[in-house]
């Protein structure tokens, strides 16, 4: 702590990112990265930007990327916002759309741990709504005064999916609140809520290119919703950083959306590997929650989760252990290649 800090800084509880180990030999199954590389066409497009044009600023509106997203989802570019990773997009949403006096912001008690961090940063009152015994969202629990609602779908870190019909029920019950569906993992088994944005002006859907499109190192995220909501995010962005995406990010992300064949192929590989891993872990006595993500959430009835994680690490396999409350005995395990998954099973 320094005497030069603004007063609120000492009260912040920052987000703790997942470990990024330096040893290349480790089997890394802790941060939900895609085990398959980016689209070769996207890599080629990014390499094409390594020229004298790097002396020039990128397009502040990222029009090439917005057009690619709009065409992919059947919306207009005016309904698309892009930013430097979905975390930045979410930060702008919290800053620009959730500061109201109608009640607290609502989100699940087991959810993305960045949400309370944003609330602390922007001074937003919030309430964590308890998931049921199966770690599922109950729509009726969100029928109370609120400043907005946000939840991951599929949820993180559980992987559980809220069906699109239930998402629509939530929207209908909260027409005067912004409802944000955080779809970081939607491509591994869910149906996007983007199909609902033309019917609900209170819906905002966020996505990332870090998971299903294998571009975690590029830092690109997006939001799709009513143009009025997008305008609010643009106003926040242009009051903070008018150039959030560089030239390589814009073109690489755009081509990643355009290369549908590669996207479909790699998503299918992850989904197939997930089902094989779930079956193998279940046979070893683990309880595995239903997952629609590129990870699974599992516990063993007779083995301590922290102990399992430590033993795996000793054998060169890293998984994520959350120590808090009702999930303290669960491990979150990223779906790797078949070889990576087998290394996990061998280590167990």
From Swiss-Prot:
Keywords: Amino-acid biosynthesis, Aminotransferase, Histidine biosynthesis, Pyridoxal phosphate, Transferase. One of its GO terms (molecular function) is histidinol-phosphate transaminase activity. The keyword Amino-acid biosynthesis applies. It comes from the Bacteria. InterPro entries: Aminotrans_II_pyridoxalP_BS (IPR001917), Aminotransferase_I/II_large (IPR004839), HisP_aminotrans (IPR005861), HistidinolP_aminotransfase (IPR050106), PyrdxlP-dep_Trfase (IPR015424), PyrdxlP-dep_Trfase_major (IPR015421), PyrdxlP-dep_Trfase_small (IPR015422). The modification N6-(pyridoxal phosphate)lysine is found at residue 211. Its cofactor is pyridoxal 5'-phosphate. The keyword RNA-binding does not apply. Pfam families: Aminotran_1_2. Pathway: Amino-acid biosynthesis; L-histidine biosynthesis; L-histidine from 5-phospho-alpha-D-ribose 1-diphosphate: step 7/9. CDD domains: AAT_like. SUPFAM superfamilies: PLP-dependent transferases (SSF53383). It catalyses: L-histidinol phosphate + 2-oxoglutarate = 3-(imidazol-4-yl)-2-oxopropyl phosphate + L-glutamate. Its EC number is 2.6.1.9. GO terms for biological process: L-histidine biosynthetic process. Homodimer. Belongs to the class-II pyridoxal-phosphate-dependent aminotransferase family. Histidinol-phosphate aminotransferase subfamily. This is Histidinol-phosphate aminotransferase. The gene is hisC.
């Amino acid at each position: 702590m320094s005497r030069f800090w603004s007063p609120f800084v000492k009260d912040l509880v920052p987000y703790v990112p997942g470990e990024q180990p330096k040893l290349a030999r480790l089997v890394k199954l802790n941060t939900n990265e895609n085990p398959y590389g980016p689209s070769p066409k996207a890599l080629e497009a990014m390499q094409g930007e390594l020229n004298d044009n790097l002396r020039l600023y990128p397009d502040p509106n990222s029009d090439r990327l917005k057009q690619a997203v709009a065409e992919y989802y059947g919306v207009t570019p005016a309904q698309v916002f892009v930013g430097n990773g979905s975390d930045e997009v979410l930060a702008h949403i919290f800053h620009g759309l959730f500061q109201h006096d109608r009640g607290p912001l609502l989100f699940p008690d087991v959810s993305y741990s960045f949400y309370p961090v944003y609330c602390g940063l922007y001074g937003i009152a919030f309430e964590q709504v308890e998931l049921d015994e199966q770690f599922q969202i109950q729509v009726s629990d969100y029928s109370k005064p609120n400043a907005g609602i946000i939840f991951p779908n599929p949820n993180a870190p559980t992987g559980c999916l809220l069906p699109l019909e239930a998402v629509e029920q939530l929207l209908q019950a909260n027409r005067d609140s912004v409802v944000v569906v955080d779809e970081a993992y939607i491509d591994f088994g869910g149906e996007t809520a983007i199909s609902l944005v033309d019917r609900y002006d209170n819906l905002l859907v966020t996505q990332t290119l870090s998971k299903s499109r294998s571009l975690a190192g590029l830092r690109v995220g997006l939001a799709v919703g009513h143009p009025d909501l997008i305008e609010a995010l643009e106003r926040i962005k242009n009051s903070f950083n008018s150039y959030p995406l560089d030239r390589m990010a814009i073109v690489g992300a755009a081509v990643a959306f355009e290369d549908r064949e590669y996207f479909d192929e790699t998503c299918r590989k992850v989904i197939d590997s997930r089902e094989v891993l779930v079956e193998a872990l279940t046979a070893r006595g683990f309880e595995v929650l239903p997952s629609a993500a590129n990870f699974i959430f599992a516990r063993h009835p007779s083995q301590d989760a922290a102990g399992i994680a430590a033993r795996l690490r000793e054998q060169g396999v890293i998984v994520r252990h959350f120590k808090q409350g009702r999930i303290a005995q669960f491990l979150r395990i990223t779906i790797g290649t078949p070889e990576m998954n087998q290394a996990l099973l061998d280590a167990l």
